[in-house]
Each structure stands twice: as structure tokens, then as C-alpha cells.
């Protein structure tokens, strides 16, 4: 059964701890142990069971049963190395599951996510991802994907006492400035929503501009080894469309 120890779930059978490299599937806990479909506060425990982590491990059990095992050949190939064709730069928003909305298989997308799908200029973390993707993985396409109802974009309108978020969002502030210089101040909720949509899409274009400031990427684009694309995902409709 699943037991909670040091805030982690371990699998015990016959009183012995199974090694981490065990090839056995994780078995669901006995029926009636807890209601897997119920909503519990984060970190809540019922009779020693870590509900949040248990849900993730049960999800992995289903993944191995319905996806990994039927496609074992594909996953064994990936175990020896990756060869993605696309670097995907997206937002960290939990409502967007990149592989799910694109139906991309494991191994097809090399993914970098952050708040606001931002390409910071002269950032070591981002530069490392970009260099590895372009120089070593030799991706053919780089995608920057924005989305509707983006909290990062809406935060551009608010004062904040946060230590890090405002500094990070300075990388997107120019998108807000551009749109506000083109349109009248919104007077209705619909107009306000449209303004945010325009800023979200302008931000994608701005981040493409930032991307092109990296010499290794610009060189790859100039030599036609890499193409850059701007996409926008609508949370309300599920539609993903090209905007740049």
C-alpha cells in the first residue's frame, strides 16, 4: 500500500521497501482508503496517505498502463537520447499543457517555460537553453507561445511589492506601451479584455525581437537553419493560432 514517510510516498509490500529502480507498476491503494476524486487541501493527509503526491503517482500508474507500455518501443528509443525539432518557449501557467494542446509526442518538443513566455535579454538561464537547443539538438523551429487571460500581462497594470516579479515583467512592459499608444483607453469590460488580448499578442512579437538579439539564434535564422514562429493559445476555445 502507499504510506507517507518524510512527506514522500513509498511503496511497501510484505513490510519491505521496494527499491527505486523496481520494474513493478505502482499498485493503487485499497478501495475505500480515500476518495481519489475528492478535493483535499494541498498537503492534507488521510490516515497517513499523502493525497497530493498519491494523485500524481496514480496518474503515473495510468500513464504507464495506457501510454508507456503500448508505446514501449518509442520510449525505449527516447531513453537513449532526444532529437526534438522544436524549441517551445511558453508560459508557466498551469492551465496550458503544451504536449496536450499540440498533441506532440514525448521527444518532439524541447520546452522552456516561464512567467509571461518571456525571452529575457542577456539571461544565462535562457541563453543556456537556447544554445543547447540550436547548437547541440539542432532544432529546426523556435516557437514563442502566448495565451489569453495571462496573469503576467495583467500584472503590468498593477503596482507590486514583490521582490522579483516586477523586475522580470520589465521584459514585457514595452508590449503594453506599444498597444496603449495605439488604442484609446478602454471604457467597458469588453474593451479592457480586448486591450489585454492585444498586449498578450504584442508581447509574443516583442519576445521574438528579444530572441533575435542572441547572435547564435540570429545566425541560425540568417542561414535558414532555424525558423521562428509566434503562436497564441485561447484558453476559452482551445484554439492555437499563428500570429507572427
Q: For each predicted feature, which ranges?
A:
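Cationic, low-complexity basic patches in intrinsically disordered or flexible, solvent-exposed regions
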Residues: 9, 19, 24, 28
Amino acid at each position: 500500500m502507499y504510506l507517507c514517510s518524510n512527506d514522500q510516498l513509498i511503496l511497501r509490500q510484505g513490510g519491505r521497501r521496494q527499491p527505486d529502480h523496481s520494474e513493478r507498476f505502482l499498485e493503487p491503494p485499497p478501495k475505500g482508503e480515500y476518495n481519489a476524486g475528492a478535493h483535499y487541501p494541498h498537503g492534507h493527509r488521510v490516515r497517513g496517505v499523502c493525497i497530493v503526491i498519491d494523485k500524481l503517482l496514480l496518474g503515473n500508474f495510468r500513464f504507464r498502463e495506457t501510454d508507456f507500455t503500448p508505446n514501449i518501443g518509442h520510449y525505449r528509443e527516447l531513453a537513449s537520447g532526444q532529437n526534438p525539432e522544436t524549441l517551445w518557449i511558453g508560459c508557466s501557467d498551469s492551465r496550458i499543457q503544451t504536449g496536450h494542446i499540440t498533441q506532440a509526442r514525448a521527444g518532439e518538443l524541447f520546452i522552456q517555460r516561464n512567467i509571461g513566455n518571456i525571452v529575457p535579454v542577456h539571461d544565462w538561464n535562457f541563453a543556456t537553453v537556447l544554445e543547447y537547443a540550436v547548437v547541440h539538438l539542432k532544432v529546426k523551429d523556435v516557437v514563442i507561445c502566448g495565451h489569453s487571460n495571462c496573469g503576467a500581462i495583467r500584472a503590468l497594470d498593477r503596482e507590486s511589492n514583490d521582490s522579483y516579479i516586477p523586475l522580470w515583467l520589465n521584459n514585457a512592459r514595452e508590449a503594453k506601451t506599444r498597444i496603449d499608444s495605439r488604442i484609446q483607453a478602454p471604457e467597458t469590460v469588453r474593451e479592457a479584455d480586448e486591450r489585454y488580448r492585444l498586449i498578450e499578442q504584442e508581447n509574443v512579437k516583442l519576445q521574438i525581437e528579444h530572441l533575435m538579439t542572441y547572435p547564435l539564434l540570429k545566425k541560425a535564422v540568417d542561414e535558414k537553419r532555424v525558423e521562428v514562429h509566434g503562436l497564441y493559445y485561447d484558453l476559452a476555445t482551445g484554439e492555437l493560432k499563428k500570429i507572427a
